[in-house]
Curated annotation (Swiss-Prot):
Signal peptide: none annotated. Binds 2 heme A groups non-covalently per subunit. Binds a copper B center. Fe(II)-heme a binds at H61, H378. Cu cation binds at H240, H290, H291. Na(+) binds at E40, G45, S441. O2 binds at Y244. Heme a3 binds at H376. Its main location: mitochondrion. GO terms for molecular function: cytochrome-c oxidase activity; heme binding; metal ion binding. Gene3D superfamilies: Cytochrome c oxidase-like, subunit I domain. This is Cytochrome c oxidase subunit 1. It comes from the Eukaryota. Pfam families: COX1 (PF00115).
Length: 516
């Protein structure tokens, strides 16, 4: 266990473990920030005393959860661990670049924390819109540090994306076509393509913001012929694909978990699932301005972005109904990963429906920047991405560690978490419809009831997080070893035992294609 093993590792399993530990730690930081938000909003009146500090917390909560929790766990953690095992590759295509992708994240996190510690912090929201993010409204180094943090996280993700694209296309056995790789591998491939195409645009946007702030350029300043709306277009051209980047690996995970615990050899409609993911990836790039319905776009532009956004519901529906068809007629095993997966399907669908509501530009004019939007994206993230992470973790934990989690405790944990997140976010739909705006630390008394309910829900979720830590400790303390694994011929990641040896597939895998 020399320190060099972890600092200089080129092993996909070790780097995957580093990502998972880092993501879990960041997840606790992000959860702490969210509890500060809910504490402030638990009753009318001021707790933190200052709107600036409140908005710094909101901004940090978003960045930590997106760039340091969901992406490192889903793409870096499970992607690194499972993709090489699932395609029979000895490691990633570029093992040292893989190491660099991980080690860019801690410095990036450090810069984000530093941005909160200098001056007044970056209270811009995660969108970092100018002129609020300009050098008048946010004098000092805070926003600059945030921009540098995003640059590092972006470089990390771009390198990781190159690595995953090369690995999934190039490292599988020659006899295997791309259409014979598991759906999780496909989901990571599509995610990587989205990252590769969208992140450079974000980098351009925040670099121009950096020069506007420090070098007197006027890209986003009307005084010099610039336009703040340009920044919004650049940001959301990245920002919308980003939300699909966050959920697509989750889609892949849910496909695996649902098929496994339905006793099926494969998910229903494999090709439909693959094409649906590719369609979602493509459509995700041509709908960005639905985040900007309130900036004064032409009616025909609004009509296009409304329609295009609604089209995304079709491939998404293909996936949801394919999961239901996979369940159909199966021998259902009611184990904890299946509970998380079923919770995912139900709650992600609810979040998708509120998304369809918001895609209507006329309705969005009213609902934009209210808690209805917050409720919508937390249903697809806090109950989509996070439920997928939990499903993956309890399903693959025996593979990663060789130990099994306590089945009763994990089920109780699921129940507590399910109640907590729903109690937190369902009332926010009511607040949004009643007109409560986002990003304010105080509110009129009329909104008190549902805010209090929401804050109680956040405390229940906190209990669930603490329970999860206990469950983790219990598993490592009890050391129940894995006895046998079912369905290994269609779930090849399990073939090497639990946990697999440090090096797998050191010789090229022999693949025999069975012709019908």
């Amino acid at each position: 266990m020399a320190i060099t093993r972890w600092f200089f590792s080129t092993n996909h399993k070790d780097i995957g473990t580093l990502y998972l530990v880092f993501g879990a730690w960041a997840g606790m930081v992000g959860t702490a920030l969210s509890l500060l938000i809910r504490a402030e909003l638990s009753q009318p009146g001021s707790l933190l005393g200052d709107d600036q500090i409140y908005n710094v917390i909101v901004t940090a909560h978003a960045f930590v959860m997106i760039f340091f929790m969901v992406m490192p766990i889903l793409i870096g953690g499970f992607g690194n661990w499972l993709v090489p095992l699932m395609i029979g590759a000895p490691d990633m295509a570029f093992p040292r670049m893989n190491n660099m992708s991980f080690w860019l994240l801690p410095p990036s996190f450090l810069l984000l924390l530093a941005s909160s510690g200098v001056e007044a912090g970056a209270g811009t929201g995660w969108t970092v819109y100018p002129p609020l993010a300009g050098n008048l409204a946010h004098a000092g180094a805070s926003v600059d540090l945030t921009i540098f943090s995003l640059h590092l996280a972006g470089v990390s993700s771009i390198l990781g994306a190159i690595n995953f694209i090369t690995t999934t296309i190039n490292m599988k056995p020659p006899a295997i076509s791309q259409y014979q790789t598991p759906l999780f591998v496909w989901s990571v491939l599509v995610t990587a393509v989205l990252l590769l195409l969208s992140l450079p645009v974000l980098a351009a946007g925040i670099t121009m913001l950096l020069t506007d702030r420090n070098l007197n350029t006027t890209f986003f300043d009307p005084a010099g012929g610039g336009d703040p709306i340009l920044y919004q277009h650049l940001f959301w051209f990245f920002g919308h694909p980003e939300v699909y980047i966050l959920i697509l690996p989750g889609f892949g995970i849910i496909s695996h978990v649902v098929a496994y615990y339905s006793g099926k050899k494969e998910p229903f409609g494999y090709m439909g699932m693959v094409w649906a993911m590719m369609a979602i990836g493509l459509l995700g790039f041509i709908v960005w301005a639905h985040h900007m319905f309130t900036v004064g776009m032409d009616v025909d532009t609004r009509a296009y972005f409304t329609s295009a956004t609604m089209i995304i519901a079709i491939p998404t529906g293909v996936k949801v109904f394919s999961w239901l068809a996979t369940l159909h007629g199966g021998s259902i095993k009611w184990e904890t990963p299946m509970l998380w997966a079923l919770g995912f399907i139900f709650l992600f669908t609810v979040g998708g429906l509120t998304g369809i509501v918001l895609s209507n530009s006329s309705l969005d004019i009213v609902l934009h920047d209210t808690y209805y939007v917050v409720a919508h994206f937390h249903y697809v993230l806090s109950m989509g991405a996070v439920f997928a992470i939990m499903a993956a973790f309890v399903h693959w934990f025996p593979l990663l560690t060789g130990y099994t989690l306590h089945s009763a405790w994990t089920k109780i944990h699921f129940g507590v978490m399910f109640i907590g997140v729903n109690l937190t976010f369902f009332p926010q739909h009511f607040l949004g419809l009643a007109g409560m705006p986002r990003r304010y630390s105080d509110y009129p008394d009329a909104y008190a009831l549902w805010n209090t309910v929401s804050s109680i829900g956040s405390l229940i979720s906190l209990v669930a997080v603490i329970m999860f830590l206990f469950i983790l400790w219990e598993a490592f303390a009890a050391k129940r070893e894995v006895l046998s694994v079912e369905l290994t011929m269609t779930n090849v990641e399990w073939l090497h035992g639990c946990p697999p040896p440090y090096h797998t597939y050191e010789e090229p895998a022999f693949v025999q294609i069975q012709s019908n």
